[in-house]
UniProtKB/Swiss-Prot annotation:
Family of the protein in this entry: Belongs to the prokaryotic/mitochondrial release factor family.
Residues modified to N5-methylglutamine: Q239
Pfam families recorded: PCRF (PF03462), RF-1 (PF00472)
Keyword check for Protein biosynthesis: yes
Gene Ontology molecular function terms on file: translation release factor activity, codon specific
Name of the protein in question: Peptide chain release factor 1
Amino acid sequence: MAESYLLDKLKSVELTFHELTRRLADPEVATDPEEFQRVAKARASLEETVDTYDTWKTVQQHLAEARQIAREAASDPELQEMAVQEVNELTEKSAHLEQRLKILLLPRDPNDDKNIMLEIRAGTGGDEASIWAGDLVRLYSRYAESQRWRVKLVSESLGEMGGFKEAILEIQGEQVYSKLKYEAGVHRVQRVPATEASGRVHTSTATVAIMPEVDEVEVKIDPKDIELTTARSGGAGGQNVNKVETAVDLFHKPTGIRIFCTEERSQLQNKERAMQILRAKLYEMKLQEQQSEITSRRRSQVGTGSRSEKIRTYNYKDNRATDHRLGQNFPLNQVLEGDIEGIIQACITQDQQEQLAELAAATA
């Protein structure tokens, strides 16, 4: 591995890993469940890097031995040929391990392990845009289920002809943000709407925002900036009308963000849920500002995560979903059923390659 700075980083990671392993055996840590969990999680995050580094060191040792045999076996052509073949195989394996180590050493997004609020807003296209937003709610719900994540609809504004003008899903599980952050942006659909009598193809859009969940410590909200009103949940009449005002309408004066929560059973729960969504929205706004600064330095092909960036077109006539960042087409039916893991993995790989190229340029 030519890059000495990478070796220095790997040695540092190895030392940290062994120190965390030692701490797990410390009786003081072992008897403190919270600290034990924190140390165990930190150690687990380094384990693949350390294991890969160990494998790489073993390969270097075997490679040096094979090269020596190849040099010294001039009088034995058969042995020399075997040694040269082993050198070639080990060199290829070493290059593969080095590439993997570079990826493992890339700085991690601090939000990658967080749960998220996924917001879908109908864009241009009227009633058809709301129906399309409903299709996206189903798509992400199916994908979340395939990942064994928990999904809950926490806020909704129904469309007049079906679907949603706006919907917010809470998605919880392992590394939710690390995958779904690549879905942020404008999703465009081209199809003949069910509401269209003449059979003309319409283009509609919906915007997806991915908001990592944050706690009160990470985002401070001044109570004076909040306007809170209550309303009755339920339908227009009959038994579904809630006689108690459990719904909460929250307005954040500095940003103009309005959140209407009706999904929880009590007013207090709806207020807590509205505040949780507000914190996530404010945090996402802060992330957008940071991301725009990064983008000005590195024009990412995989996308900026901006709400205004068109990332995918879903064409019903041609039965294809085109991801504009990857420049690739995918089978529409599979994508609509939530089969987007392949797209997301391709985005992750492309993002990593861009970061590696940037790192190489910076250290050249």
